[in-house]
């Protein structure tokens, strides 16, 4: 449900920017290729937001969903892994629109530690200093962008100092303790799903319903004997 709320919020932001004041669930569904019944069910779980004969007040609903998702308060983000992916994530300016600010990068490469990289000129810290920097920078969300073999160890490190929200880009499923949420971004499985679709006879342009578009957290492992890489 929370993933769909994020999509609704993006849609409502677009409507608000366009100056639209009210919208029905049906119109919202048609305009953004959503499911009107699912919209009503999801929103009904959190309260009564619609007005009979009017629909939803765009600005009010946007503000409610922002609070439900906890986006009315700022979040400070650290990224472990200052390679191409980690640097690209640090440079992404879309996080700020959702009240996330990347404040620190970490790596184990001595040639990167102590240098400032990316558009924001973020200092790359030694990953061994992650506990101290998390406390000093008041980081509450960590992003893991390291090779698969290092990911669980890195997760254990950040969990040990109280981090409860982790976005994982490493190609491996991770084990988290109770009370810690790990969200894995699985690009390979999504591409494999598209490959399956293309391989079927009479494939047509079908967009999966939002509620069915989640994928499992599995990546192929690095082949045996592959060279270890720093992060």
Please provide the spans of the model-predicted regions.
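Extreme N-terminal segment that seeds HTH/winged-HTH DNA-binding domains in transcriptional regulators
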Residues: 1-21
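Phosphate-bearing ligand-interacting subdomains
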Residues: 11-16, 120-201
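HTH-adjacent hinge/linker in prokaryotic transcriptional regulators
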Residues: 22, 26, 31-76
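Glycine-rich adenosine-cofactor-binding loop
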Residues: 70-112
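Short beta->alpha connector loops
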Residues: 83, 147-151, 224
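Conserved mixed alpha/beta catalytic, RNA-binding, or beta-rich assembly cores of soluble enzyme
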Residues: 92, 99, 116-127
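Short, low-complexity, charge-dense intrinsically disordered segments
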Residues: 205-213, 220-229
């Amino acid at each position: 449900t929370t993933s769909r709320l994020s999509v609704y919020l993006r849609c409502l932001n677009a409507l608000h920017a366009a100056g639209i004041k009210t919208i029905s669930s049906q119109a919202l569904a048609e305009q953004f290729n959503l499911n009107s019944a699912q919209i009503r069910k999801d929103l009904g779980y959190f309260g009564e937001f619609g007005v009979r004969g009017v629909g939803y007040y765009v600005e009010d609903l946007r503000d409610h969903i922002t609070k439900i998702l906890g986006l009315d308060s700022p979040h400070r983000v650290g990224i472990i892994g200052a390679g191409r992916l980690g640097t690209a994530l640090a440079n992404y300016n879309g996080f700020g629109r959702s009240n996330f600010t990347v404040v620190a990068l970490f790596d184990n490469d001595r040639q990167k530690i102590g240098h400032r990289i990316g558009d924001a000129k973020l200092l790359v810290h030694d990953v061994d200093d992650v506990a101290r920097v998390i406390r000093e920078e008041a980081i509450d969300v960590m992003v893991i962008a390291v090779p698969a073999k290092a990911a669980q160890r890195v997760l254990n490190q950040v969990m040990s100092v109280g981090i409860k929200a982790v976005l994982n880009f490493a190609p491996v499923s991770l084990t988290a303790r109770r009370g810690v949420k790990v969200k894995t971004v699985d690009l390979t499985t999504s591409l494999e799903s598209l490959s399956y679709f293309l391989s079927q006879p009479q494939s047509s342009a079908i967009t999966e319903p939002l509620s069915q578009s989640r994928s499992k957290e599995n990546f192929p492992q690095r082949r045996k004997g592959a060279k270890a890489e720093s992060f």
